[in-house]
């Protein structure tokens, strides 16, 4: 009877393998998004710890019993002059960017022709000015933008002229 009515549970709705109560996905190894994120973080931490142990093992030089002449480290220090100081750039908060965005949002957009407030429903023409729904057409507001030459340039860029080499007659 279950075959007739197809009352089987779909394979995509499986519970998480960790039994956390959420649904898992086959794309995330039958884990829910929370458990999968935790798994990814653990893998990244393990890989970073492996890298640090490899780097530390490479930086330690093997002890040499017969050669007492080598007293300097294998890798010379990058900075031998102590009077030169390294400048570490500090994180500075960029305040000018949000203020310009706020100024643009606070400034009311008005139609250039009738000075009607348009807000978000305004239309910006290719000539660079803002218009309302009535004056948005180039014929109505006397647009100075040359649509024909712009169209020709776009077509020329999209379809470059392909010139084949001439065939020589035998």
Curated annotation (Swiss-Prot):
<comment type="function">
    <text>May be involved in environmental stress response.</text>
</comment>
<feature type="binding site">
    <location>
        <position position="35"/>
    </location>
    <ligand>
        <name>Zn(2+) 1</name>
    </ligand>
</feature>
<dbReference type="GO" id="GO:0008270">
    <property type="term" value="F:zinc ion binding"/>
</dbReference>
<dbReference type="InterPro" id="IPR035896">
    <property type="entry name" value="AN1-like_Znf"/>
</dbReference>
<feature type="binding site">
    <location>
        <position position="125"/>
    </location>
    <ligand>
        <name>Zn(2+) 3</name>
    </ligand>
</feature>
<feature type="binding site">
    <location>
        <position position="20"/>
    </location>
    <ligand>
        <name>Zn(2+) 1</name>
    </ligand>
</feature>
<dbReference type="GO" id="GO:0071456">
    <property type="term" value="P:cellular response to hypoxia"/>
</dbReference>
<feature type="zinc finger region" description="A20-type">
    <location>
        <begin position="10"/>
        <end position="44"/>
    </location>
</feature>
<keyword id="KW-0479">Metal-binding</keyword>
<protein>
    <recommendedName>
        <fullName>Zinc finger A20 and AN1 domain-containing stress-associated protein 6</fullName>
    </recommendedName>
</protein>
<dbReference type="InterPro" id="IPR050652">
    <property type="entry name" value="AN1_A20_ZnFinger"/>
</dbReference>
<feature type="binding site">
    <location>
        <position position="132"/>
    </location>
    <ligand>
        <name>Zn(2+) 2</name>
    </ligand>
</feature>
<feature type="binding site">
    <location>
        <position position="135"/>
    </location>
    <ligand>
        <name>Zn(2+) 2</name>
    </ligand>
</feature>
<feature type="region of interest" description="Disordered">
    <location>
        <begin position="53"/>
        <end position="76"/>
    </location>
</feature>
<dbReference type="Pfam" id="PF01428">
    <property type="entry name" value="zf-AN1"/>
</dbReference>
<dbReference type="Pfam" id="PF01754">
    <property type="entry name" value="zf-A20"/>
</dbReference>
<keyword id="KW-0863">Zinc-finger</keyword>
<feature type="binding site">
    <location>
        <position position="143"/>
    </location>
    <ligand>
        <name>Zn(2+) 3</name>
    </ligand>
</feature>
<dbReference type="InterPro" id="IPR000058">
    <property type="entry name" value="Znf_AN1"/>
</dbReference>
<keyword id="KW-0862">Zinc</keyword>
<feature type="binding site">
    <location>
        <position position="32"/>
    </location>
    <ligand>
        <name>Zn(2+) 1</name>
    </ligand>
</feature>
<feature type="zinc finger region" description="AN1-type">
    <location>
        <begin position="105"/>
        <end position="151"/>
    </location>
</feature>
<feature type="binding site">
    <location>
        <position position="111"/>
    </location>
    <ligand>
        <name>Zn(2+) 2</name>
    </ligand>
</feature>
<feature type="binding site">
    <location>
        <position position="114"/>
    </location>
    <ligand>
        <name>Zn(2+) 2</name>
    </ligand>
</feature>
<feature type="binding site">
    <location>
        <position position="16"/>
    </location>
    <ligand>
        <name>Zn(2+) 1</name>
    </ligand>
</feature>
<dbReference type="GO" id="GO:0003677">
    <property type="term" value="F:DNA binding"/>
</dbReference>
<feature type="binding site">
    <location>
        <position position="141"/>
    </location>
    <ligand>
        <name>Zn(2+) 3</name>
    </ligand>
</feature>
<dbReference type="InterPro" id="IPR002653">
    <property type="entry name" value="Znf_A20"/>
</dbReference>
<feature type="binding site">
    <location>
        <position position="127"/>
    </location>
    <ligand>
        <name>Zn(2+) 3</name>
    </ligand>
</feature>
């Amino acid at each position: 009877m279950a075959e007739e009515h197809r009352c089987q549970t779909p394979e995509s709705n499986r519970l998480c393998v960790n039994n956390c109560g959420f649904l898992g996905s086959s794309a995330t190894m039958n884990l829910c998004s929370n458990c999968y994120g935790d798994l990814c973080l653990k893998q990244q931490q393990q890989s970073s710890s492996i890298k640090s142990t490899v780097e530390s093992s490479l930086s330690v030089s093997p002890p040499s019993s017969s050669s007492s002449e080598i007293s300097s480290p294998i890798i010379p220090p990058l900075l031998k002059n102590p009077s030169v100081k390294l400048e570490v750039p500090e994180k500075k908060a960029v305040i000018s960017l949000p203020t310009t965005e706020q100024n643009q949002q606070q400034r009311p957009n008005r139609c250039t022709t009738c000075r009607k407030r348009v807000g978000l429903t305004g239309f910006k023409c290719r000539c660079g000015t803002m218009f309302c729904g009535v004056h948005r057409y180039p014929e109505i507001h006397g647009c100075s933008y040359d649509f024909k030459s712009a169209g020709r340039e776009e077509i020329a860029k999209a379809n470059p002229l392909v010139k084949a080499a001439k065939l020589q007659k035998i």
